[in-house]
Amino acid sequence: LLTALTLLTVLTRPALADIKIDIDGVDGDIRRNVLALLSLERYKDRDRIEADAVQRLYNRIDDEVRSALRPFGYYEPIVTDSIQPPDAQRHWHVRISIDPGAPVLLDTVSVKIDGPGAQDPVFKTALEHPPQRGERLSHSAYDQFKGALERAAATYGYLDARLVRSQLQVNLTTHKADIYLQLDTGERYRFGKTTIDQTAVRDHEVRRYLRYKEGDPYDALQLLRTQFALDDSLYYSTVEVLAGDHDPATHTVPITVHANNARRGYSFGVGYGTDTGPRGTATWTVPRVNSLGHRFRVQLELSEIEQLFDVRYDVPVGDPALDKFSLDLRGEQEQFGNDVSSKDIAFAPSFTRTLGPWQRILSVNLEHTITTDPIENRKVDNLVVPSIVFASVPENYLGEALFSREIYAQLIGSTTELGAKENFIRFDLQGERVVNLSSRWHLLLRAEFGASNIKDIEDMPGLYRFFAGGDRSIRGFSYDDLSPISLTPSTHNPMTGELIPGVAAKVGGRDLLTGTVEIERDLPRNLGAAVFFDGGNAADRFNAPLAYSVGVGLRLRLPVVTVGVDVAQALRAPGFPSLPGPRLHLNISPKL
C-alpha cells in the first residue's frame, strides 16, 4: 500500500529514467540472469519514462526473478522488493532481496542409447559427464548434455537419430528432479561418391589427400581434416568440402569438393632480435610445378649473424599431406659467438614421413664447408653427412608448418671415408613444453642436450659444434658466448723475434646442456609478465661448471606483431673474468 501511494504521488509526472537497482542474496551467473530478465534493467537507460510505466515494470519483478532462478534449480524463491520515488537527482531506487530457497536436486538420471549404434564408442565422449544424482538441477547442463548426444549422432553419421524420450520432471514437494533421455540411433550412414571440382593436379593425386574412403562410416571430422589437408597442400587459394543430402535408401552421404587454384606466391617478414640484429625473410613459392603436385620454393634469410639462400623441390609421396621426398640446395654463412664463423654449401636429398605422433626425416648432406677460427684460421671440409631426425607432431597433424616442437632429436655423423677430417657422431635433443597452470598462469619448460664423439673438436666443422647463450638459450649472456676456451698458437714478432703468447678463443664444445624454467602471467591488453631461470653451458665434458641467470620479462602479443622484452642477470659465469652485468634481450617479430 505504501509503495502504491508513493507511486501515485508521481503518477502524472515524467521522470528521468535513471533507475538504480540493488540486488541482494544472489551473485555470479544467477545475478546476471536476474538482471537479464528484469524489465526495469532494460528500461533504465531510457531518456524519459512515465511513473505509471515504472509501476508496470516494478509489478513484474516477482515473476521475472522467479523465472531467472528456475534454470538454476531454485523454484521457490522468496522475493522482497521496494521502490523509492525520484530523489533530488531524480533517480528511482529499486531494492530487490532474494532468498533462493531450497534447491531442486537430481534424483533419477536415466540415459539410454538404443538402436544399431548403441555400442558404438563414438558416443563415449558425450556420455563421459552426464548430470549426476545429488547435483543441483541446472537447465543449461541438461540442455548441453542432451545437445552433446545429438551432436555426436550427427557428427558420426547417425543422421536419422532421434530422442524418443526427453523428459525433465520436477517435484516441488520433495525438491527432486528426474531426467529421462532415450536416443534411438538408427543406421549409421557411410561416405558415398566424392565429386571433385579442381584443375590444379590430376584427379587421382588430389584424391590421395582425402581423409576417408568411399564406403567408410561417415565422420564429419574427416571432412574437416580433408579441408585442412587440401588447404595445407598450397595448391589452392580456396577449398570447400561439402556434404550433400543423405540418401535414406542407401544410407550414404555424397561429398563435393570445390577448389580454386593458387597462384605463385611471395611472402616477406622482418624483425629484430638482440641475437640477430635486424632480420628479414623473403620467400617465393611455386605451389604446383606440374600436374603431379610437385612444389618449388626459394627462400632468402638475412641477419647480422646468418645469411641463408635455400632452394627446395618437394615431391609428395605416400600420404601426400604428411610424406615427401625433397631435394634441397642451400648456401649459408653463420657467425658463432665472436670467434668462429662458417660458410656452407650443401645439397641434401631427404625423405620425410609421419608415423603417428612422430615425424621422421632421413637425409644425406653433401657439404662443402669453410670454418674460420683463431686456432686453425681457415679449414675446408668436403664431406658427406647422413642424418636422421625424429620430431613430435601434434594430434591430427596434416603437414602444416610448425614453429616449435615439444621434442626434436637429431643424430648425424660422418667418417674419414666420407670426407671428414676425423670420424664423428653428434646427437642433439631439444624439448619444450607449456603447462597451463590456470587460465592466466603458464609454466614454460625448455631444455636442450647435446653430445659429440670426436677426438679433437677443432676437426669438426664449425656448424656442428655446440655453443650456448642468447635469447633462446641462456639469457644474461650474449649470443653463443658460452663455450670452451682454447688458446691460439704462440707466434714470434717478425721484426724483433719476440714471442707473442696465444690468446683465448671460444671455438665451441663437444657437449651441451641448457634448461629454462619460466612462469608467465597473462595481463590485460594482450600483455604478459614473466620471471625465469636459465642454466647450462657448452663444454668438452659434462662435469664442467654451469652458468646460471635469472630475469624478468614482458610480452606483447598482437595479431600483427609479437614483442618480447627480457632483462636477465647472470648469477654464475664460468670462464668469464668477472660476472656480466644485466643484459637486455629484445625480440620483435612482425607477421607480414
Segments (PLM) and residue ranges:
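Bacterial N-terminal signal peptides
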Residues: 2-10
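N-terminal signal peptide c-region/cleavage motif recognized by signal peptidases
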Residues: 12-14
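Periplasmic polypeptide-binding modules associated with outer-membrane biogenesis and secretion
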Residues: 17-29, 35, 42-277, 283, ...
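Short, solvent-exposed loop/turn segments at secondary-structure junctions
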Residues: 96, 181, 537-541, 571-573
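Gram-negative/organellar outer-membrane beta-barrel architecture
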Residues: 116-122, 219-408, 435, 475-476, ...
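C-terminal outer-membrane beta-barrel translocator/porin domains of Gram-negative envelope proteins
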Residues: 232, 251, 372, 379, ...
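Strand-loop-strand
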Residues: 543-552, 556-558, 562
